[in-house]
Amino acid sequence: MALKRSSSMKTQLVDAIQLEEVEMEEEITTTSNNNNPVEPAQVKEPKCYTVEEAVESIGFGCFHILLFVIMGSANIVEAMEIMLLAVVSPEIRCEWHLEDWQVALVSTMVFFGFMVCGVLCGYIADKYGRWKVVFGGFVWASYFSFLTSFSTSYGWFIFLRCMVGCGVAATSQGFVLKTEFIPAKYRAYLLPLASIFWMMGSILIIVLGMTVVPTMGWRWMIRFSVIPSLVLIGLFMFIPESARFQVSAGNIQGAMSTLKRIAKMNNGVLPEGELREPEVTERGNAVTLISSAFRRTSLLLWYSWFVASFSYYGSVLSSSELLEKNLLCVTDPDLEHQIKHIQEETLCYCIPFNSDDYQTLLISCLGEVALIPLNIILLNIVGRKYSMVILLLLSAFFFMLVNICTTMLGFTILLFLLRSVVSMNFNVVYIYTAEVYPTSVRSIGMGFCTSFSRIGGMIAPFIAQVLMSKSVILALSPFATACIICAIGVFFLPIETRGRALLQDA
């Protein structure tokens, strides 16, 4: 009996030990699971993707062609409003008996409006959306441009053109809107083609000058020039808000609708899963532009934009001035002064453009697109940064060559090449700026840059239209010098954006 009781106690003791071991194993397993809560075999995370991945997955298609045509047409409107100044200058000089500085002030006031509103429009675009700003800019610019044709005095004319400059500042945000929809590998091919539309706008205003001004006057030319803006206002309804902005503003549902619409038009597919990206609360914060991450980039870009505008409008207005005052091959300042004022004693001492002058301006406009293939090759092979360096040095070279005494054909060829390289440089600066800044500050970054560019545009008329009367080489040298200094600065830009995904937040 005692033996049986002893055997039973041993059995109970063994069972107790085994039970304790099992409990310890379960505790170890539980602890292990707590330390490693995600096991691929046990828990599956839902798939998610970003806007960048969605844009790359959808690819290029019909939507981008529509985007290219409509947003490219915005360049037509902008070019017409800016190039209008070169065509109308001889006419208003005659009508209101203006001095050189007064004619130059017209261009300066347009760029002043652009400069003041550029930063404001960039801030609003980052805060409330790109689409609203661009659409409002078209309406604003067309309205005040139309009012310009009814100007009764020089004062009203420059005020209304200043208001037009504010509207054009808003439309420049269209480049940001366009960039944010294009896949990375296509940006270097599509964005340079914006020059085609700029050329079309320049040609259109020159053709209007040739046909309308001699018969109906400059006022009707301005009225006709508003028509493309009105057409574009209707077409712009087909362009959606930027999906990148919608995500940064926390509007995931709106971004999904936009991406689905693009995918449907392109016959593309969205990545598997759901769109997920954190909301950016600090949107449109200008302090980011001068933070340690972007300080050197911003400072160099601001000067690059200044020079891009300074050299571009310098080339446009210099050619206009040389043709209007017949200063080609005139190197003696006294003779220049004599030619300039040869008709000053008459009632109207302006010298309007003739057909040959208009033809020269037309041919020089073609230079803005003739070298687009070279621009695309440079962007894809040497990148954005070194493309700017090369183009700036070429710009300086051709600015000095324009001063060489040659025939009208030789002058036209030099002008053609000069307009090619300065417009190519302007285009590359646009592309680099849109790519280097994150979505949270892309528009205000572009706004600051365009504002600095308009400072260059404000100064250019006083050199190209006022200093030109003193000495041709004295007027052309500042443009060449600025390009050389800028080329050195661009070399030290810290970021190359070729093939780089667009950042969402800083």
From Swiss-Prot:
Major location (coarse): membrane
One family name in Pfam for this protein: Sugar_tr
Gene3D superfamilies, per the entry: MFS general substrate transporter like domains
Localization in the cell: Membrane
Disulphide-bridged cysteine pairs: none
Membrane topology designation: Multi-pass membrane protein
UniProt-recorded Gene Ontology molecular function terms: transmembrane transporter activity
Matches recorded under PROSITE patterns: MFS
TM helices/strands, residue ranges: 57-77, 104-124, 133-153, 190-210, 220-240, 297-317, 362-382, 397-417, 444-464, 472-492
Cellular component GO terms, alphabetical: membrane
UniProt entry tagged with the keyword Transmembrane helix: yes
Keyword list, A-Z: Membrane, Transmembrane, Transmembrane helix, Transport
Protein family according to the UniProt entry: Belongs to the major facilitator superfamily.
Protein name: Putative transporter SVOPL
Organism expressing this protein natively: Danio rerio (Zebrafish)
Gene name, Swiss-Prot/TrEMBL: svopl
